[in-house]
Amino acid sequence: MRRIVNSTYVTLDGVIQNPQNWPSVGGFTDDGNQIQTKLLGRCDAVLMGRHTYELFAPVWSARSGDPLSDGMNSLPKYVVATALTDPQWHNTTVIDHDPIETIRELKEQPGADIVQYGFGRLSHALMAAGLLDELRLWLHPFFVGSGTASDLLYRAGSSGSFELADSTSLDSGITILTYRSSAT
């Protein structure tokens, strides 16, 4: 069975929203790019919610000529959204009905892992359904110092149990914490 691997940027104070506005995104240094490219290379699909799609599509669709951009653009992308009717990013399929069951069926199909970007309602629903197998937190070494409850990694009512599988420190000061679901 395929695995769902979530890759998310988070600050020391737990903020996950709008990393493009952070003082330093920092994940796209050479060592960060290599890790992102390696993860993408072991996956054959990308999964995201609408908010992440709206941030990613204009950026990634305009890039090409490197393994990370080419991988993001060529892989099938699945977007959970009810209000997205005509996705412009190449190779995008909208999941607009019964997303958990649809994703469960995707996971049961033969193939490589599925990478999921962003950590919002979709991630919490995947975790609750036991479908999130691995969590990669790119821990950025600063506090944003502001935000609302929806800007945080933690959401009321969410629970899940993970075990640390790996940690990698980048030259930028970012630490990538890889956790695997205890239920898997």
Predicted features, each with a name:
Residues M1-T184:
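Enzymes that bind and transform nitrogen-containing heteroaromatic metabolites
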